[in-house]
Amino acid sequence: MAGAFLIRRSWRRFRRLFDDLALCPLLDYRAYRQTEGKVYRFTGRLESVTGDRTLWIRGDKLTVPVALAGAETYVLPMQEGGGQGAIFDPGEEAPERIRWDRVSTLTDEAKVFVGGTLEMRDDCRIFAASPGKPLLLIFYDGPDRSLAVRAIRAGRHRNEYWNPITPYALVLGALFLIFLALSFLPRPAFHVTALVAFAAVFIPLFPMGPPGVLFTVAYRRLWLQARIFRAYRDLARLPLIYLEGGTGKSCLPGNEQYGAVSLDDLPGEAEGGNIPLLIPEEEKRKKDRWFVYGALPEPGGRPFEPADVFAVYGALPGEPEALARRYIRKACVFEIAAWLLLLTGIGLNALFVRVIIALL
């Protein structure tokens, strides 16, 4: 259980860090030559990894070094499947966190996003992590403009209750129960206690045995749906990075005006794919209005695609905070239902085993 909270917290931190970097300026040649100690974003392609743990990223007009030591490095999973549903599905795989020594095994020309502090080291400006100043590296494929949505959508664990800590917890629990059973076994008065302890060793296997395995399958489906709703919640909140309350206007890091317009009907451009939907159209309620986010045009026009490729551009089927509250409620309902099904399956299997033992 503790591992589940740690895993969920780590992915929440990943998404928050990416959101914070969206408000930082993009690094260009002028800033690279004149500033240090400030936080920037930069994108390019993997050029090389040198022996001193330095990654070189080649952009359009600039090549910058990145100190891999201490960097939080992730590989974004490729989008699987096709069709409209796959666009919004966070997928079953979370971004993979990798060690610095695995970076050199990645394909040459892989796309890279880096965000963090630009420091001066050995007379060279370099992206580097330091205490209180994290450095985020993301390797990805596909269009740059899709990275922000994909990172927030997929940046969550498949199932927090099965994580890297879980196998160790199960082994330690099993060893403790075996030790408990062996300590009580020589005492005739505690034979039942010893048998119960031995039986408890196999409780983690109960969800996978018949007939309760059907409940486990249903549990996994409900849990995946809850994960999708949590992704929708975070996607609905994406525009709030730039606009407090989801309305009004603000200025992007590149001094471009950013804002939203509220419409009764979905613009025709969206039907042709020119305005991406951040959440499926089917999620809209009749009383809600469409909110289109992007760079602000002249008064009376609709927002258009910002020059900053990481700025959110798209339409939401409702007000962001209201959508976020709706999806978190749905996610909680599905998670509770999933747990009830799983526990029901375990109880059914326990009853099944008890009946078999009684017949023997």
Task: List the model feature ranges, each with a label.
Residues 1-360:
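OB-fold and OB-like single-stranded nucleic-acid-recognition modules
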